[in-house]
Amino acid sequence: MAAAWSWRASHSTITMTSGSLVVLFLLLSIWQPAVQVEGRRQMANSQEMIKDHLGARSQNKTPAITNNANQSSTSSADLDDGAADDDDNKADLPVNVSSKPYWRNPKKMSFLQTRPSGSLLTLNCHALGNPEPNITWYRNGTVDWTRGYGSLKRNRWTLTMEDLVPGDCGNYTCKVCNSLGCIRHDTQVIVSDRVNHKPILMTGPLNLTLVVNSTGSMHCKYLSDLTSKKAWIFVPCHGMTNCSNNRSIIAEDKDQLDFVNVRMEQEGWYTCVESNSLGQSNSTAYLRVVRSLHVLEAGVASGSLHSTSFVYIFVFGGLIFIFMTTLFVFYAIRKMKHEKVLKQRIETVHQWTKKVIIFKPEGGGDSSGSMDTMIMPVVRIQKQRTTVLQNGNEPAPFNEYEFPLDSNWELPRSHLVLGATLGEGAFGRVVMAEVNNAIVAVKMVKEGHTDDDIASLVREMEVMKIIGRHINIINLLGCCSQNGPLYVIVEYAPHGNLKDFLYKNRPFGRDQDRDSSQPPPSPPAHVITEKDLIKFAHQIARGMDYLASRRCIHRDLAARNVLVSDDYVLKIADFGLARDIQSTDYYRKNTNGRLPIKWMAPESLQEKFYDSKSDVWSYGILLWEIMTYGQQPYPTIMSAEELYTYLMSGQRMEKPAKCSMNIYILMRQCWHFNADDRPPFTEIVEYMDKLLQTKEDYLDVDIANLDTPPSTSDEEEDETDNLQKWCNY
């Protein structure tokens, strides 16, 4: 070996010293015997393992390939009680023989159930016994438990939960008892958020070598929130490269592929394929079938030779690495003085930043899609560590969040000049600004915000991108997301929200609620006629019709969420907010006395269900606000329960004073208790077009001494019986 190495060294292009050759000779002399001994030991161990494996499987003579996707599971309590010793024998017991409880089919009982949110889960604990046992369900060790959201159904042996949410996660235990004993089974339930994606590979099949007539298996597990289809595809081969063109599907909807009494013709490639509506994923492994142990021994010996070659390559590479390291150290020494000066001036600062990741829906903004509602973008925030260099005493720049760059909407911060604050809430505020000599509004978060507040602002921005532009909605103009806080730039409405605008410009005679000690208000800046009010309602209907065509549900349509722009163009705002109905307290009274429940449809009050028809109900309430110059609907109702009882009884708000019957008819159509009876926004727009095109002269509205009782009188009931006749005027 030393001679061989000396010959290679003499022909090498690298000049080495005699000391290096001596060190290399010693390393090889020590390493080679160790490798040979290790190779023989691994070969012997492989032989023993294969013999033991064959001995354990020699008694199993069943068909060549079987498939089993569900492994049998028996709880520890079953084993303690002896209930799982012989399930088949117990199933054959006579009816009059006393027996403590035992599981009817323990192989179908699993210890772990993973489901996406919004799906249905059924836990089954079917047991037998004499006398007939009873069952008790526990969640996290508690017997008296309920769900915070969704229905819960307990049948004889099953527990069913619909519309799963992350709050349903936990340990569920079924305890079955009779007078002779008890058994129990635990199931861990995990509910994960839905993510639209093609199947994601979790565990793929591994290459497998089996001796003829032995047994083995391959495993394949994918994660998919959508309905998926799985299949195993087989390609026969004689060696990994000499393969047939014939492909066949040998199993479907199985996570595990079992090989029992394997034959030579079963050698080949096995591919696990799973697909859903968004695509497919696959993973492939090779099954090698050998006739005897000698083939495996030859493979082990060949592997030993490859290991020896690897040692030579490793040592040679190590010498090159040492040589390059020496050159690097020499270069570093020459630069040491310069580096020392730089270290005195530059300090490395490690910071933790948060990366904002946006999962955009595929086809979520397509109005021609088959979905009833628009798919909201998913926003995730992940922590990551970054390194920043600080020069001298100047503080290092720090950005708490890292946002993805969208070049189609990004604006330079230097073009943005912030001005006065227009309004602010608990965690966000809106500021007037100027961009390229144009007045805009900028949305941002306040100090003390949380990650959820950032995610909500990002989600609102992404929804506005998906929806697009329309004259009667607040449109997105751009954003500033790089090298600083997130600014969402939208259109500016100089006249504020519609509710305040109507109240400021209400006609004289609507001051009965004003304190007599206060001076009379100044005349309105703009005299609003009934035709102006109808134009306002028409613009809002057009904006809502556009949002409905984009599969967007507003959920909070009210005069306070409609802004008045230049030339009294109305624009619907806050349609991009992703509201969590379960976590938002819609029943709590705000400090200004407004109750958002008064704009909600009956199905939203009772079932938290929202769709375009629930927005139509809210539009009817908004229409009433317009015709009363921003008055509060249902002034005497102060709770959700009272409002729902009021609506269930068939009562509705009366027609505002001097409001035309045509407009009130539209209100009543929007307030149908059955959502299917409410007109869509497309028909509302057509109805408004007819009203505006009529030759009838509209009088200026002068609503003096207006009284809005909470119920509908009998006289108005006679008028509403002829709604269809008025609609076809």
Swiss-Prot record:
Residues annotated as the enzyme's active site: D556 (proton acceptor)
Signal peptide, first to last residue: 1-36
Low complexity: bias regions: 66-77
Segments of skewed composition (Acidic residues): 78-89
Domain Protein kinase: 416-692
GO molecular function: ATP binding; fibroblast growth factor receptor activity; protein tyrosine kinase activity; transmembrane receptor protein tyrosine kinase activity
Annotated residues for binding of ATP: L422, G423, E424, G425, A426, F427, G428, R429, V430, K443
Membrane topology type: Single-pass type I membrane protein
Protein name as catalogued: Fibroblast growth factor receptor homolog 1
Organism in which the protein naturally occurs: Drosophila melanogaster
